[in-house]
Amino acid sequence: MKNLLYLLAFMLTISIQAQTPKEESINLNQNWKFIQGDNIDYAKPGFDDSGWKAIKTNKTWEESGYEKYDGYAWYRIKVIIPLKLKQSAFLKDSLRIYLGKIDDFDQVFLNGSLIGVNGKNAPDRTVPDTLFKSGTQSFWDAGRTYSLSANDPRIKWDQENVIAVRVFDWNGGGGMYTGDQAITMINISDYLAIENNKVPPKFEDNNLKKTIDLRNTSSGYTIEGVFSINAINKITGEVLYKNETKNIELKPQQSKTFDLEIKKPDQSALITYRFDFLKAGSTVTVTDETPYITTPVSLASPRINGASVTAARPSKPFLFAIPASGDRPMTFEAVNLPKGLNLDKNTGIITGKVDLKGEYKVTIKAKNTKGVASRELTISIGDRICLTPPMGWNSWNCWGLAVDAQKVVASAHIYRDKGLMNHGWTYVNIDDGWEIRGDLNPKRDPKGNIITNEKFPDMKRLGDSIHALGLKFGIYSSPGPLTCGGYTASYQHEEQDARSYASWGIDYLKYDWCSYGNIVKDPTLQEYKKPYFVMRNALIKTDRDIVFSLCQYGMGDVWKWGDEVGGNLWRTTGDITDTWESLREIGFGQVKNQPFAKPGNWNDPDMLVVGWVGWGPSLHPTRLTPDEQYTHISLWCLLSAPLLIGCDLQRLDEFTLNLLTNDEIIALDQDPLGNQAKQVVVDGDIQVWVKDLADGSKAFGVFNLGKETANYTLNLEKAGLKPGGELRDLWRQKSMGKTGNSISVAVPSHGVVVYKLK
């Protein structure tokens, strides 16, 4: 869990561009100086920083040569703020200092005075302290904007000013890193909020409906202008909607609502919202994209989905719910079950224990009034488990440390009520926040057994309720003394904790490096391995199979040795966020680890960031566009990545369900061959990834990383694909006929098409 919780500086708008013809700015992305360590005197304008090193602020300090450095560091820059900046502004009352994103915590000083902390303005005469780094929330992905009255005496107009930035980094990348730092005056356009996703779009009567709010956030200015909305099909360019409203007047704190309705799209569409200010001569433009459904409606007749192989170790509890879609009620049958297993014919849940090793071929059947479906299921009883990537839900990306038992139970029931478990979704995993906080006592009982906090009064009962639904139960800890969120972890209590997990019915353990980095400051490869060996040995001694998820962000090329320490999956990077930049960097970076994925061992590029996420009590719709979400799910499935839903399942909408219940896409992830797709083509903004499948066919995705729709012709042989095969569009579950030597596709910006070639 990179940097614990990060607090999202989230706005309900996407791709905002404010344009003011005469607005001037001072670029701050050059001439910064840097030093490691901490001394509050560094904030003083007269401090001699001649011995400091120059540093770029468009990359973390690790990328600038300060590898593996965590803790305090300072940045300083000297800049003349010209009076004409104020004189030429439409509004002349406030100066804005934007420092981009800072990893993790910051205090910002102007001419020796503290003006801001972690993205919030500091009251005048605030005394700096060290509490700014003591919270459980990191701000590494939040932009830092600080403002002062233009009449503030701390600003030296037409003179040299010193900006000093005190940074504290927990771990991983640190410092200022976005390269877009600047000083500007606040404009009237900064007070207009175009809230286009405050209420998620809805599909009704074969139409898509959206509500847009215009809001004046100022306390003293009236906003006047013209508001226009335009929607086009991103593939064809067809105009889907066009409207202009003139003579809009928004008084301070006033808002107005606009409704948009278009025919339910079956392709990507772009909506542009534009507000033209009458007096300021500026505009605000916001763009977003409409969700569109590609997954066909499930049939009423039975269909068996999910993995065709499952595994357990000899004499360990076995649990498998037959994943079948179709109308209920439904009955189930399993032919040739191994000795020790039993099927509940009404629920489709298989339980028991098998003592003898073997590969057991079982015919599973599902029946309702519309028909019968059957498929072979291989039950592997042996030394290896987790033969297909885990599919489930994890509490972190939505609830963070605000998770509680009620939220977990609700999520488990939604698996059943929304039909997720009918498509193979299995695990219900609690992340950080179930333990006693590190600053409270007692953390353990007199015998050293870990204690749960008041949010989880009965973990065994919770596990039993999850198992009763045919689902599996996961939990979280760290090899250090504390978890990333500052809760009690497993250091020097590994065997006790493993026994506790087993007694609660735990099926999955995420084991997060976190505070173990304070024990091993500069770990060697053997030190990277050590804590995972210790917990692996503890888990093996229990009477349950517990999937072992290593979470240490890819350090030491974990994919090369994760299997050796007993890992079934291992994180390959830091935490993902719901941004295109994060998705692109993490997802398309899974290249060098490709050879190491196989049944029982999976590269984990982190959880899914579709639906409503938020890393705490305040949630928002993902910032990924619909096309980016299609890319997200497609790439993860091609990569044979673990699929862990990270959103609030109680807010599942039709579009997100469409992403999570396409059985032909999920089948790529759950293919028993366990092959991770290879990147075979990089052609400008186009990438092609190809995956070998167990039936001898190949699946491939054509991804467009560019900003515009791409019309692309793929030479099949150059991509390692055989011409003349049967082509199938997997998202639309539609046969496309035989191929020639190439195929031509239109791929929307940040989007994908996924095919199977047989």
Identify the meaning behind each predicted range.
Residues 303-327:
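Solvent-exposed, low-complexity, repeat-rich "mucin-like" stalks and linkers
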Residues 493-496, 544-648:
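Glycan-recognition surfaces
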Residues 52, 79, 84-115, 163-167:
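Aromatic-lined ligand-binding clefts that engage carbohydrates, nucleic acids, or primary amines
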Residues 125, 389, 397, 411-524:
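Aromatic-lined carbohydrate-binding/catalytic grooves of carbohydrate-active enzymes
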Residues 24, 28-31, 36-39, 52, ...:
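An acidic-aromatic loop/edge-strand motif
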Residues 738-758:
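C-terminal beta-strand-rich structural cap/linker in extracellular carbohydrate-active enzymes
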